[in-house]
């Protein structure tokens, strides 16, 4: 299997998800890499449908162990035609809970065939100098791992007879997806935090 184009579709309020997705794409080494930033609502334009010759990276941070509600509707509009895909979640050094499973399910529902899936650590959006959480991540080692992950995917696809043969049958996570007991309290508290990442101007 040869991949002509890698399209990275990413939601990245703090920029770290974008960086990790880009390094994965570099590792895959396709002739063309397209970066689609869907962080701001104004940038969420129709994208696709994608073909079998494409490879799509879907990348997002983890909020409360889930995919951010903000980006769920847009990801659900993406359509593949048996297109290989790589769901990627980025979390702040605690747990990613059911986020990877949720993103995997979104991809499958959209006609994509996940050939790999990854979870990477980045500095938490609530990290402060007084209370650092995964400070300065991803670091050089993290980025090397992300690029190596992409290289491994390229090698896997090169020896696979078909997309179906390369497709993952499952990823870590559960259904129904986790619902934090204090989710509403968290959302209310988050509104008052000045360093909460913005997703639009």
List each language-model region with its residue ranges.
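FMN-binding flavodoxin-like domain, especially the glycine-rich phosphate-binding loop
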Residues: 1-7, 14-41, 46-197
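Iron-sulfur cluster-binding cysteine motifs and their immediate structural context
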Residues: 200-201
């Amino acid at each position: 299997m040869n991949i002509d184009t890698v399209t990275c579709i990413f939601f990245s309020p703090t920029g770290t998800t974008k960086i990790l997705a880009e390094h994965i794409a570099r590792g895959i080494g396709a002739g063309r890499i397209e970066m689609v930033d869907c962080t701001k609502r104004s940038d969420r334009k129709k994208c696709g449908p994608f073909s079998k010759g494409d490879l799509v990276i879907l990348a997002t941070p983890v909020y409360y162990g889930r995919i951010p509600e903000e980006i769920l509707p847009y990801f659900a509009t993406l359509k593949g035609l048996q297109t290989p895909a790589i769901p990627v979640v980025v979390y702040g050094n605690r747990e990613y809970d059911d986020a990877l499973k949720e993103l995997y399910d979104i991809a499958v529902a959209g006609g994509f065939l996940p050939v790999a899936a990854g979870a990477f650590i980045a500095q938490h959006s609530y990290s402060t100098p007084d209370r650092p959480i995964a400070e300065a991540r991803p670091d050089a080692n993290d980025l090397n791992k992300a690029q190596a992950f992409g290289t491994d995917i390229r090698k896997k696809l090169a020896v696979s007879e078909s997309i179906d043969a390369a497709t993952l049958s499952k990823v870590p996570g559960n259904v129904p997806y986790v619902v934090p007991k204090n989710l509403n309290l968290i959302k209310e508290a988050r509104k008052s935090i000045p360093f909460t990442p913005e997703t639009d101007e």
